[in-house]
Amino acid sequence: MAMTIDVRVVSAEGSIYAGVADMVVAPGEMGELGILPRHAPLLTGLRPGELRIIHGAETEYLFVNGGILEIQPDMVTVLADSAERATDIDEAKALAAKQAAEARMAGHTDQMEYAAAQAELLEQIARLKTVQRLREQGFVR
């Protein structure tokens, strides 16, 4: 019997995913993390990006906007700042938000506003990259 790992993805909005996986790929702060059953315990931050939950031939694509990742040998828990199924991303809305953030940054407002616009820009770029990957996989037109 193949080994699996329990996966829970939750955000302030509620539970996004609960199930088992053969492998989880998460956007860690220092780069992508590939997590298999019996992984060493780890607690790390997440950056905005694509979370892939692989079970057999099926892959579940989620988008997380930062958060905390806890890994135990038999369980992965994602406490996301916000999360959504990647297929639910509104590409036009993400592109408009990206352009608005770029405009705010170009306006050279104060340092706090610039940092907030930069964070928004990075989030929207990550959303658009997730949509692009889904398009390449044939999930989005």
UniProtKB/Swiss-Prot annotation:
GO MF entry, a single one: ATP binding
Domain of life of the organism encoding this protein: Bacteria
Subcellular locations according to the entry: Cell inner membrane
CDD domains per the UniProt record, alphabetical: F1-ATPase_delta
Membrane topology: Peripheral membrane protein
HAMAP family per the UniProt record, alphabetical: ATP_synth_epsil_bac
Subunit structure: F-type ATPases have 2 components, CF(1) - the catalytic core - and CF(0) - the membrane proton channel. CF(1) has five subunits: alpha(3), beta(3), gamma(1), delta(1), epsilon(1). CF(0) has three main subunits: a, b and c.
Annotated family: Belongs to the ATPase epsilon chain family.
Protein name: ATP synthase epsilon chain
Phylogenetic lineage: Bacteria, Pseudomonadati, Pseudomonadota, Acidithiobacillia, Acidithiobacillales
